[in-house]
Amino acid sequence: MRHRSSGAHCILSCNHVLSQLNAARLGDEVLQPAPADGGVLPLSIIGGVLGWTPVAFGGVERNMTDAAIATCAPGQARSWVDGIGAITAVAPAIALGARVRKVGRATGLTSGIVTVVGASVRPNYAPLGFGQTPALFVNQIVAQIDCAYGDSGSLLVDEENRAVGLLFGGTRSGHTWFNPFDAVCAALDIALLDEDARREAPGTVS
């Protein structure tokens, strides 16, 4: 991803992954792989927290995104997902029944269909150790696709490899929740690395 305002190359994940659910400070070190996967200081540092979308708790105030970005070296940022390939664009919308895929840290490459658009969901972050009351998220995408702890931050794509959503939660019955990707990009002021170039090139469609 690219941060539009600064031009910085960055990685994208969830607020609760990169920013400790609103508790991070700008510039906090980000490790890849994470400590749970064998990452160690200082060898695994890839950058620092650049920004996040705050999550409001209490179940009344509405949230749209649980997302965050961190800086990285230009050569480390790619509009590419292993197992899926190049991400071609940001999908303007997604239809019920659309076939989608994602690659997650825990469950790998899985596919499914979109079952709800415009959903309201209340993820419970307490099992992740944050000890917060549930938060209300509106206008979310729900897909019948496998996920597990560790998959948060995965990118959901459609059959044209367009970015559809950012995985942030789900249920044990296989209903997985995604922030709409266009809302994530707008909230964090980010774009795919070559998105602007495609839009400006004559005769191209993005």
Ranges and model annotations:
Residues A148-D151:
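Short, small/polar residue-rich loop motifs at catalytic or cofactor-binding pockets
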Residues M1-Q140, Q144, V157-E160, V164, ...:
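Serine endopeptidase catalytic core focused on the charge-relay Asp
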Residues L193-D196, A201-T204:
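Charge-biased, low-complexity intrinsically disordered regions
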Residues S173-C185:
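A short, polar/charged loop-to-alpha-helix boundary motif
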Residues V17-S19, A186, I190:
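Short, intrinsically disordered, mixed-charge
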Residues C72-P74, L188-A191:
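Short beta-strand-to-coil "C-cap" segments at the C-terminal boundary of structured domains/repeats
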